[in-house]
């Protein structure tokens, strides 16, 4: 990936030395204006059945050191791609909806395959089946008791804290889901909020914690490769992986005097 580093003043955001640019239309935007424009950029994507997402994740979350394995999001272990928990077998993997499907009303039919938010691969991660159940419908926040099976993960009755190595990954997935799903054409209207224990409302917290995680755990090569792999299938990207700074410009401290962007070269962009 070619990188072009440009120092930008927030009153003007020239995002590109490339033309055309995937993000060209977000220049000079902040707050809800920026989020709404990102929504327009990423809202049209190829949809796949839920069954198909298993194959997408086998590529997107492939262990860089073992092409036969995937990396589990909360445990951090590398296990065989073929150890899929079709019947919730212990120590096998299944698909974790990082934005909980019940907190968005996008439960789908796993037998026949559901489209849209339910099968959006950006929101799905390989996860140990028992840990997926332990996380359940909990919001994200810090603190609680250690999970005995997933080292580095903590939990309370209402919150889940992932291991440090994927805190930023989780935050950027949640930010993507908020920007992507705004209630268009019967889709869920998802909103990241400061509150927790939001029941079945299409809300996910805790916003302030997720903003901290976005900064504490920067984007790495694994996350960038995953974003590109999913783009190859869905033809939409997670903007918060390409530009983590977007999160603060929308929800956080947008008074910074300057930010740095890596300009992403994309194939198949017209």
Task: Give residue ranges: language-model regions.
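Hydrophobic alpha-helical membrane context
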Residues: 14-15, 109
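Residue-level detector of functionally pivotal "anchor" positions at catalytic/ligand-binding pockets or at interdomain
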Residues: 257-270
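Domain-level detector of nuclease and nuclease-like folds
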Residues: 87-260
């Amino acid at each position: 990936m070619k990188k072009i580093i440009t120092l930008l003043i927030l009153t003007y955001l020239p995002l590109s030395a490339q033309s055309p640019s995937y993000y060209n239309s977000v220049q000079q935007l902040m707050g809800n204006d920026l989020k709404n424009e990102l929504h327009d950029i990423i809202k049209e994507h190829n949809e796949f059945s839920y069954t198909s997402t298993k194959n997408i994740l086998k590529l997107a979350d492939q262990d860089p050191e073992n092409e036969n394995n995937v990396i589990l999001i909360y445990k951090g272990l590398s296990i065989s791609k073929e150890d899929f928990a079709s019947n919730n077998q212990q120590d096998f993997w299944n698909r974790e909806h990082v934005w909980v499907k019940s907190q968005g009303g996008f439960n789908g039919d796993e037998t026949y395959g559901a489209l849209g938010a339910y099968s959006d691969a950006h929101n799905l991660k390989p996860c140990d089946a028992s840990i997926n159940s332990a996380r359940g419908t909990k919001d994200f926040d810090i603190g609680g008791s250690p999970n005995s099976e997933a080292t580095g993960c903590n939990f309370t009755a209402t919150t889940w804290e992932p291991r440090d190595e994927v805190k930023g990954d989780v935050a950027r997935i949640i930010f993507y889901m908020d920007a992507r799903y705004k209630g268009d054409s019967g889709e869920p209207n998802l909103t990241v909020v400061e509150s927790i224990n939001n029941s079945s409302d299409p809300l996910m917290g805790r916003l302030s914690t997720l903003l901290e995680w976005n900064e504490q755990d920067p984007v790495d090569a694994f996350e960038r490769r995953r974003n590109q792999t999913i783009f190859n299938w869905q033809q939409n990207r997670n903007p918060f992986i390409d530009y983590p700074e977007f999160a603060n410009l929308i929800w956080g401290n947008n008074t910074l005097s300057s930010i740095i962007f890596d300009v992403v070269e994309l194939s198949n962009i017209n």
